[in-house]
């Protein structure tokens, strides 16, 4: 059994220490070691986007990131999007627009949307579709998801005014 590596990172605003094997994916550690199971395992090869998180301001699929690479980094998972028991406007918009069904892809879409709206608070439909191109949904199709992102952007802009 390989020696475990000690890693320190900030997850959802909280300093977190964990031990991991050098070959463990960040997804495996988030779910199985830290207990953040909101990040879903879909394809486990980076193609579906279900496990999308924000790592140092960029969206990544942690199924393709080694956990040891998280040393000293900041990450946001789906659990870090809401403010306590109050849903984030993105989450609320996904509910109101029925932009989810089975829920496997939803955390990845919401996290990717958060990163998009942090970078571009008023994206065009084309920009939304481009940004979310690496997130796949087999249930709802994409129109409701795109509408949810547009509505969330409008709500968030109104909150800043």
Model regions and ranges:
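Signature of N-terminal electron-transfer/Fe-S-associated modules in redox systems
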Residues: 1-161
């Amino acid at each position: 059994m390989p020696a475990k590596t000690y890693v320190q990172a900030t997850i959802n605003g909280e300093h977190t220490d964990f031990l991991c094997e050098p070959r463990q994916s960040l997804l495996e550690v988030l779910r199985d070691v830290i207990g953040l199971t909101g990040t879903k395992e879909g394809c486990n090869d980076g193609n579906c986007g279900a496990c999308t998180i924000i790592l140092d301001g960029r969206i990544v699929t942690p199924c393709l990131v080694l956990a040891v690479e998280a040393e000293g980094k900041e990450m946001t998972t789906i659990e870090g999007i809401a403010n306590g028991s109050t849903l984030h406007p993105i989450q609320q918009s996904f509910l109101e627009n029925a932009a989810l069904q089975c829920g496997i892809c939803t955390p990845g879409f919401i996290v990717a949307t958060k990163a998009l709206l942090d970078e571009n608070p008023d994206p065009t439909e084309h920009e939304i579709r481009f940004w979310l191109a690496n997130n796949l949904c087999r249930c709802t199709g994409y129109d409701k998801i795109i509408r949810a992102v547009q509505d969330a952007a409008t709500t968030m802009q109104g909150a800043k005014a």
